[in-house]
């Protein structure tokens, strides 16, 4: 409710309060209406704030009482129409009116500043808004006026209209009302300081008693110009009207307060009079401005409703209507409900509720009207309208005229025929009074056997009862022609139709058809036949009855002598039949239209009947019917009698249907009567008292009049015309009695013929059934009819012949191998000279082609010589006994030759003149060209190549020194070169290599800084820079240093060292010469030396004696000690050899590690390719998946399915991006691990150098043990990784299956299944692609892990760091698994989709956040790739460091060996050099470790991004779970509704069927069915199917809008992915700057 201010108009407020108290005491319809509105924004659903609560229509005890809707501000937030608003056309300049006329504050007004919407908005004095008109400057002044129109949209009881002005109050204005939307405007109140002059009304504030109170007053009370702002006017609709105190009894005032529209007309502005001077600024200060309009009112409901509710009208507009009670109706409750007009409608008052009373229509009408006359007579004014069930009267208490009431109370139309009835009114039983000859309850037809319905009644027909339908005489009511039986005709139905005989009253069809085997239609009753029956009572035995199944497998029959019946039992589930004996079979035409009877009883089985329970077979036909046909019952454990009429009529249900002739044909030669015995598995049945009604000639009994005596035409004989007369025969022959008889035709060569076969007894050398051919060996025209028609044939062996014309006769039965008109030639496939034209006569013999010709072909061999001409199966030769050229095999194999094409390599095989490759016809060995080998000549000899030349193979000419062997590539001739060797023949060193030998060429390895170039000479000497020396130019000359600066001179202080070194070299040279001299002359002449030597000998002797003395007590002798020392020395040597072996193994491991890092480069490149493939897959498959979801949405409109598709697509996109990020992180981790391992490898090499000597043996042994331990760890880790990969795959497969199993609440179930199949097929394709991608990556990672195992032996110290990284990635993987698990749980718990709009709105924003997270994950891809490149650079550096370490290790080994040979001093120098180089390597390794730490930090940052992505995914899953629960609920609701509807349909069908099958109609049955119908109707209404469908359609529209938004978001994601793809393509494929560590 708009907040109002009342303080500026205390008098009007006090008046409203006073009136409110007065009306409250009188309980008027506007109770409390005058209380000022409070500060509130609440209220009605559409508008207003409740000032006073509603009064309910029923008290706590359920008794009706007057009720009122809540009292509200009816104008709140309604749009007001204004005919003038400032700024509407252009911005208006206006000035604010103040008491200071010398200074005015002027502003510009724009339309949006003060438009009419501010008249009814929330009024806040702290932030006022108002409507404002244009100024007097624009012409706003009398006579021009401004209208403000408020459309309330419904009639209200108006209490007051309050107007709060922002400008001074007008000098004159008017309030109008309208009581209907199309009604006239009625003045409500005039305000003017000049009432008489302006409105021609006196200035008055009240109406005197006795005057009309429903007219407007004019008052000058509120026309003063003061106050200049916030002046208020409050108009009360009942103020000053005397009858207001009795409002409930004043219809005039009740109409007065009613309004649907309010209009305020502003006629004249209040001014100070200064506008007369025309000052523009003064004119712009006068305008209308209103800050608030409030209308205090109640929804008009005439005291019969407590609230108004929004309703949708016929044209779709939303309006308020009263929620009527007291059995009232209408928007204002201004009338009674259609069936509640027993009292006249009245407005409810505080003393009289005036509740509408129901009319008494006995439940037979839905509406009535108030009949004042009826009310005056009876006290009840309800007169029923449109009575149902043909009722009439004020209370539908009697039947209409010409209707009668049945016993059940229903009125039925008499419907008496006006022609045949004496009166249109019937009696109480509905029977009309008929004229003579007329019958029927309605007198609408002639009676049986009467016709010519007319005003005088009907005439008698005189029909024969025996020939009339159902033996009841009746005729056509117009023509008088009787209704005859099927085979009867005549006006009186006293004649058989042509082709029928024996008019019989007991014959349903009247007459019996003439059978006569179809030769005539004239017959009569044959005399001498009597009615008999063929029976089987089984009094003594089985009477030759048998039993068999449908496959004629016999089944035993048991005879029960006590019950005198037969029985049989099935062994399984086969159908067993009783079969009648011969006396029931044969010619049984006399049983036509008679009965077959028997008794059947089942034992312990329930009958599962079929369509062939009783079978008749005969004349090659078979007919059958079910056991329950012709009104018979289903067999059970009781004895039942069965009767079947043998007639073709469709009512008797014999199938297939037959004509009368067809049925009689079966009976004329009845071959089997079968009665089904078993109707279940191992069923048992009993048969008794079988009877077949028939007739026999000469038997005692009643005459059988249905047996025919045929009148045969010429050529036929017999009672039934079944035989041919002499000179006639059946055609065709042996056709039986059904075939016609024709005269015998023997062409003059015989006089008689067989009547059945028609065969003539021929003479005159003729034969044939009709003597129409010459006998064998004779020729001529046997049809001539003379004895000399046939002559003997001129053929060998009296063979048959054929006459072509008068002069030509051809033999037709030549011996095998002969042909020709006289059998004078050999046939095709034979050879010889039967006439001796070429010499001696030769008989015709079969050609011998060894089965290698087509027996169906013509001309396989020469008919004279027997040479085979058309060999097949790749054979050739005179008798097809050889293989064709270019083929080999066995041409004489059985059943035909087997010659296969030579499989020769064309370029390596010799060819014949026809360019056909040749091979041995037995072995298939091809004829090879020079230096070519192989069965197909497809290979060169070892040491040869270029087989494609077509000239044989060329010699490789591989250099025996530079190649591994004499072989080369079979096509290019490239020999297999040793390391460092190149050239096609491996005969020269590669660039930067030297020393061509059997071991290959060695690398020059020229130092970069010390060499002039990298190419060395043949001795390996590199070209050194000045002051540089060494083979590799890798050291400065003496007294020079700093090779990188060009080996500059050492400081001067080193000159002393140089001098000392030269002095020592001189001394060493002299010492060397002295030693050489001693070696040349070993004799010495030194007495002193001799003396010392003697003294030493004496000491030795003493020591020897001491040794002997010391060993005398059983201890070890020195000799034994020496032996032990020798053994220990041998052991040391063995350990040393083992150490050498271990060191060699370590060197091998180092070499393999270097190879592994090369492989790592390849792995990195592969990883980049896989990343690009993943991006391409996202672009293609992601777009396709969304397109499919949109197509399904448009086609089916099922919001729940589209939500699931959208969420799955979004999740799949996020998962795929996250998977790619995980994959890149894995590559980065692998690269980091490789760097760490390289660092540890270099350090291990350094440690290995420091421990050369006595610690070498133990160090290598320890390293090897670490290798074994690490190998076990790697194997276990690989198995664990494989297990987890399988678990991930199984989880993905399970998720896919769960998605395929989800269903949505869709009405078109069949179409949904089709879509599901299509979706499953597409899902299978995607799964296959994912699996292939996973497999390719699995092989890539498996290769990397395999190579990693080889380097684990020397990387022990990296294990701890590796474990930390693994733990880090495991946490990321666990987060991903957690998100995947959440998705699975969401898919499995999909349950509800009602009221999902709010959730989906949040879902959209979450999907957006998820997309942003996915973008962040994609943005990390370039960083990851950069880290991979950095890792590659570090790997390269580590590889170079390993090369140096390897070389150092080799040098260390060599130095150790030299130490063993007593070169200790040189070894010490070398060791010192090694330590210095190792320190340099250590510094480089430390730098690598720092870079690896940085890489580890980046990995952790990436892990944080993954954690954020997990949180976003979890939020998404929660929202999806909620939406899916709603989908499940919608599905359950839909299924429940469907069940209820199906149940209702079933109930309706049952009610309908019961009504149709209701034989005797009674009130109880109808009431019961009516109750059931009402129950079904209530169930259908409770389902509220229409409301649910409408709700789903609205949600479908909402979901479609969401899908459009998601489509736009996906397009943005695709653009981002494309940008990332471009960035990825721009990255270099490898790192080209690889710094080498200082050796």
UniProtKB/Swiss-Prot annotation:
Highest taxon above the source species: Eukaryota
SUPFAM superfamilies, A to Z: EGF/Laminin (SSF57196)
Region (Domain II and I), start-end ranges: 1050-1609
InterPro entries for this protein: EGF-like_dom, Laminin/Netrin_ECM, Laminin_IV, Laminin_N, LE_dom
UniProtKB keywords: Basement membrane, Cell adhesion, Coiled coil, Disulfide bond, Extracellular matrix, Glycoprotein, Laminin EGF-like domain, Repeat, Secreted, Signal
Localization of this protein: Secreted, Extracellular space, Extracellular matrix, Basement membrane
Xref: SMART domains: EGF (SM00181), EGF_Lam (SM00180), LamB (SM00281), LamNT (SM00136)
UniProt record, GO biological process: animal organ morphogenesis; axon guidance; basement membrane assembly; basement membrane organization; cell adhesion mediated by integrin; endodermal digestive tract morphogenesis; extracellular matrix assembly; midgut development
A Pfam family assignment: Laminin_N
GO cellular component: basement membrane; extracellular region
PANTHER family given in the database record: LAMININ SUBUNIT ALPHA 5, NETRIN/LAMININ-RELATED
Protein name: Laminin subunit gamma-1
Lineage: Eukaryota, Metazoa, Ecdysozoa, Arthropoda, Hexapoda
